[in-house]
Amino acid sequence: MMKRFTKQENSWVLYDWANSAYSIVVTTAVFPLFYKSAAAESGVSAAQSTAYLGYTIAISTFILAMLGPILGTIADYEGCKKKFFGFFVSAGVASTAMLAFIPSEHWLLLLLFYTVSAIGFSGANVFYDAFLVDVTPEKRMNLVSARGFGLGYIGSTIPFIISIAVILLAQAETIPVSVSAASQLSFFITAAWWGLFTIPMIKHVHQRYYIKKEPHIVINSFKRLGQTMKRIRQYRALFLFLLAYFFYIDGVGTIITMSTSYGSDLGIGSSSLLIILFVTQVVAAPFSIIYGKLAERFTGKTMLYVGIVIYMIVCVYAYFMETTLDFWILAMLVATSQGGIQALSRSYFAKLVPKRHANEFFGFYNIFGKFASIMGPLLIAVTAQLTGKSSTAVFSLIILFVIGIVILAFVPEETSTDVSQQQNDLPL
């Protein structure tokens, strides 16, 4: 019988509850609408503002992709993982709070602080993901990782509901606050939520697997980084999984971050978009947990196939989408898989990596994900500019899922795993 979740597991899971508010309010819902409105008031066309947002996302992910591997390598040393985690959380929370105080006419400055907040959010996730090996054994990783995403979707709905309520009341002129001010209040609420519920993670989760500190940490970290690059190619399962992940997670991330902007381009009202995104969060919560449970029965790889195929259907459907009802259907399709595919990717990879070098390898997990996240938004941005049609840009993402699922077919089936044990026994 499955034992109850430990204090360390619950504290780790609770960070998903904390940072998912940023993911829905800032990345997906309110900020894109606030930014699109601010840019439109400054005379920027819908297609151009979508392109600028795509470029901004690409820049932030490129910066983190450059920093991720070396920071992860340094963080493998004793006592370093939590320090780096705390630094990026602090940067993310502070810059998110700053979005609440920048006048809407300064839309370029908004993009700048959004970039910093995105780097803080994603940077903290590198170390958060790597802590999975410290808080739970391999046999529970799928379950704990999926619980994190599930709880994250549930928790994010609370600040999201508050944000929607304030914005809708402002639109109806029920409260003496402008829609712009109401939107910015949601950024401050998100920052406070993120910071508050990070505290249990800081207090109760500790680095169990590490390398003893030595002289010249930075220099030696660069040396170890080079060694890791060579070793990754030697681990066939690990390398193939990262390659598949590079493509399919790009499509997933791009759809998540650009969905609200796309809906706005189709003429769907901001109120409808916010409600749709809220329902998406509610639906996604149980499906994330279901993915984790089904992975215990059918293997994580099988459930990854399911998620990728659903996203391929999303790309095709998005091309023909015209009405708000179509967007509802699209959102529900995404909701069934977005949490599950991310949770199982995280736990699948965690089972393959040497635990003492988890940050080092998760740094590469991050760089594969982040470089992929550059390609997707750029594909959206360039296609939108060339064709003037957001639907064509979204449809083009299907090629990423096709390539990803083909490569994933060559990855050995998930086991408990012999590969991971062999890697842990190797002198690194």
UniProtKB/Swiss-Prot annotation:
One of its GO terms (molecular function) is transmembrane transporter activity. GO terms for cellular component: plasma membrane. The chain crosses the membrane at residues 14-34, 55-75, 84-104, 107-127, 149-169, 182-202, 238-258, 272-292, 302-322, 324-344, 361-381, 392-412. The keyword Transmembrane helix applies. It is a multi-pass membrane protein. It is found in: Cell membrane. CDD domains: MFS_YxiO_like. Its main location: membrane. Keywords: Cell membrane, Membrane, Transmembrane, Transmembrane helix, Transport. The keyword Cell membrane applies. Pfam families: ATG22. This is Uncharacterized MFS-type transporter YxiO. The gene is yxiO.
